[in-house]
Amino acid sequence: MFKFLITLEYDGSDFHGWIEQPKTSTIQGELNKAINRVTKNAVFKTIGASKTDTGVHAIDQKVLLDLGFNPKLDLFKKAINKALPETIKVRSIEEVKQDFNIRDVLYKEYSYTINDKEYNILSNRFELNWDFEEIDIDKLQNIFNLFIGEHEFKLFSGLNHKELDSNKITTIREIESIDVKRALDKVVITFKAKGFIRYQIRMIVQSALNCYLNKKISADEIKEKLQGKGNKPPFNAPAKGLKLNKIVFKS
């Protein structure tokens, strides 16, 4: 089998996440259908580096493709893009070594975008609309600083009791950085870590925004929950504001 690394971008609005599912439109499912059509039912396998959730977008998703033959990559890329929906596109395809490991990630970078200005119908699919006063960047940054570093994130995850009890998923994680900036009149919150748990970023974002508004959760309660104490906060920021920006592999 030949191995290829695909860089994929997509508008996740109309898809039920990354993972292929029967009778449901997903990013991996659409990619597999396109490859199957182009290769005329050749044997292949795809593995994504990040399992983005329903409604989440990406500009740098990485996909390992195992394929039984070595195609001309420029023609292969064009053919796959022609077979894909308009909201999913292959940016690049390159051959990689046989020992390449799609899980050998140095870090992943996600961003969450908030529009605290006038509603924009053209960008609405990619941002959270903020119905309050303009956001104070420094004040919001101070709240997000609580989440930086190594913490127990089980209460800021979408893991159910069975998953938590199995101990198969590590919930003590380190977030390297969270940066709150204003870009093109939007508030952009950028997260960097080796990996994230399901719903982790969206639960952090909504908790921080609620804390910013002095609603439902305080800074002290956030600190307690980051020690695994108490209950899960029952809020989750909308998926449409979240985007996978970058995946960097170890050398």
UniProtKB/Swiss-Prot annotation:
Q: What is this protein called?
A: tRNA pseudouridine synthase A
List the EC numbers from the record. Answer: 5.4.99.12
Q: Which domain of life is it from?
A: Bacteria
Annotated PANTHER family: PSEUDOURIDYLATE SYNTHASE, TRNA PSEUDOURIDINE SYNTHASE-LIKE 1
Q: Where is the signal peptide?
A: none
Sorted alphabetically, the keyword list is: Isomerase, tRNA processing
User: Partners and quaternary state?
Assistant: Homodimer.
Q: Give the active-site positions.
A: 53
Record organism: Mesoplasma florum (strain ATCC 33453 / NBRC 100688 / NCTC 11704 / L1)
User: What are the recorded Gene Ontology BP terms?
Assistant: tRNA pseudouridine synthesis
Task: Write down the HAMAP family for this protein, in alphabetical order.
Answer: TruA
- What task does this protein carry out? Formation of pseudouridine at positions 38, 39 and 40 in the anticodon stem and loop of transfer RNAs.
Q: Does the keyword Isomerase apply?
A: yes
Family the entry assigns: Belongs to the tRNA pseudouridine synthase TruA family.
SUPFAM superfamilies per record: Pseudouridine synthase
Q: Which reaction does it catalyse?
A: uridine(38/39/40) in tRNA = pseudouridine(38/39/40) in tRNA
Tagged with keyword Isomerase: yes
- Report residues binding substrate: 110
Give the GO molecular function terms: RNA binding; tRNA pseudouridine(38-40) synthase activity
